C-alpha cells in the first residue's frame, strides 16, 4: 500500500508542468563611451576645460607694431614711385605729342630753308634794269617763276618778315649797321639788306637790316 502511494506521488511530481520563468528585461544601453571609451559627459567636460587663448605679450605687440610701420613705409614708398612713374609717362606722352605736332606743322622747314638762296637770286636778278627787249622778256619769265615759287611757299606757311619801318626785334631782325636817319624813331629798321623769312611762328632766317640810332 505504501509502495503504491509512493509511485502515485512520484508520477504526480513528474506530470506537474514546468513553471514559466519570468523574462528579465534587458537593461537600456547607457549613453556610454564614444571613441576611446570616454563617456559623453566626461568628453564635454574636457572641452570646457580647455584654457582660453593667451594674451599677446608686450614684446609681441611691439614687434607687430614695428612690422605694421614697416609695411606702411613700404606702401608709401611704392605710392610715391608710382606717382613719379605716372608723371614721367605723362611728360613723355605730352612731349611726344608736341614733337609730332611740330613735325607736322614745320614739315616744310628743310625744303623752305634750301629754297631761300634761290629766292635771293631771283630778287637780285629782278632788280636789274635793262632796255633790251629780249632781256626784259627773260626777266618777265623769271618774275612769273618767282611769284609761283613764293605762292607755293606761302601755302606751306612761309612768309617774308616785315622789316622797314618796324621797331627792331632781335628775334626777327639782325642789325648789321646803325646810322642816323631822319623821320625814324631810334632803334627802328630803316633799310633791309637781306630779306628774312619765317615758317608760321618759327624764324627760318632773320632779316639783315640797318637800324636808326
From Swiss-Prot:
<protein>
    <recommendedName>
        <fullName>Protein GrpE</fullName>
    </recommendedName>
</protein>
<feature type="region of interest" description="Disordered">
    <location>
        <begin position="1"/>
        <end position="61"/>
    </location>
</feature>
<dbReference type="GO" id="GO:0006457">
    <property type="term" value="P:protein folding"/>
</dbReference>
<dbReference type="GO" id="GO:0042803">
    <property type="term" value="F:protein homodimerization activity"/>
</dbReference>
<comment type="function">
    <text>Participates actively in the response to hyperosmotic and heat shock by preventing the aggregation of stress-denatured proteins, in association with DnaK and GrpE. It is the nucleotide exchange factor for DnaK and may function as a thermosensor. Unfolded proteins bind initially to DnaJ; upon interaction with the DnaJ-bound protein, DnaK hydrolyzes its bound ATP, resulting in the formation of a stable complex. GrpE releases ADP from DnaK; ATP binding to DnaK triggers the release of the substrate protein, thus completing the reaction cycle.</text>
</comment>
<dbReference type="Pfam" id="PF01025">
    <property type="entry name" value="GrpE"/>
</dbReference>
<dbReference type="InterPro" id="IPR009012">
    <property type="entry name" value="GrpE_head"/>
</dbReference>
<dbReference type="InterPro" id="IPR000740">
    <property type="entry name" value="GrpE"/>
</dbReference>
<dbReference type="GO" id="GO:0051087">
    <property type="term" value="F:protein-folding chaperone binding"/>
</dbReference>
<dbReference type="GO" id="GO:0051082">
    <property type="term" value="F:unfolded protein binding"/>
</dbReference>
<comment type="subunit">
    <text>Homodimer.</text>
</comment>
<keyword id="KW-0346">Stress response</keyword>
<comment type="similarity">
    <text>Belongs to the GrpE family.</text>
</comment>
<keyword id="KW-0143">Chaperone</keyword>
<feature type="compositionally biased region" description="Acidic residues">
    <location>
        <begin position="13"/>
        <end position="35"/>
    </location>
</feature>
<keyword id="KW-0963">Cytoplasm</keyword>
<dbReference type="GO" id="GO:0005737">
    <property type="term" value="C:cytoplasm"/>
</dbReference>
<dbReference type="GO" id="GO:0000774">
    <property type="term" value="F:adenyl-nucleotide exchange factor activity"/>
</dbReference>
<dbReference type="InterPro" id="IPR013805">
    <property type="entry name" value="GrpE_coiled_coil"/>
</dbReference>
Amino acid at each position: 500500500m505504501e509502495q503504491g502511494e509512493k509511485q502515485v506521488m512520484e508520477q504526480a511530481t513528474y506530470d506537474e508542468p514546468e513553471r514559466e520563468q519570468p523574462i528579465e528585461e534587458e537593461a537600456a544601453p547607457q549613453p556610454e563611451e564614444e571613441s576611446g571609451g570616454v563617456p559623453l559627459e566626461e568628453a564635454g567636460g574636457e572641452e570646457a576645460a580647455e584654457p582660453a587663448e593667451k594674451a599677446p605679450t608686450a614684446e609681441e605687440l611691439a614687434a607687430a607694431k614695428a612690422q605694421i610701420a614697416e609695411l606702411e613705409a613700404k606702401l608709401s614708398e611704392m605710392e610715391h614711385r608710382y606717382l613719379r612713374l605716372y608723371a614721367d609717362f605723362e611728360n613723355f606722352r605730352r612731349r611726344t605729342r608736341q614733337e609730332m605736332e611740330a613735325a607736322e606743322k614745320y614739315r616744310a622747314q628743310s625744303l623752305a630753308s634750301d629754297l631761300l638762296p634761290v629766292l635771293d637770286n631771283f630778287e637780285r636778278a629782278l632788280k636789274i634794269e635793262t632796255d633790251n627787249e629780249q632781256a626784259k622778256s627773260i626777266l618777265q619769265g623769271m618774275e612769273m617763276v618767282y611769284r609761283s615759287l613764293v605762292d607755293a611757299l606761302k601755302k606751306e606757311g612761309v612768309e617774308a618778315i616785315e622789316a622797314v619801318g618796324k621797331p627792331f626785334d632781335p628775334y626777327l631782325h639782325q642789325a648789321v649797321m646803325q646810322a642816323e636817319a631822319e623821320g625814324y624813331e631810334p632803334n627802328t629798321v630803316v633799310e633791309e639788306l637781306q630779306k628774312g623769312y619765317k615758317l608760321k611762328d618759327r624764324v627760318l632766317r632773320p632779316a639783315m637790316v640797318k637800324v636808326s640810332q
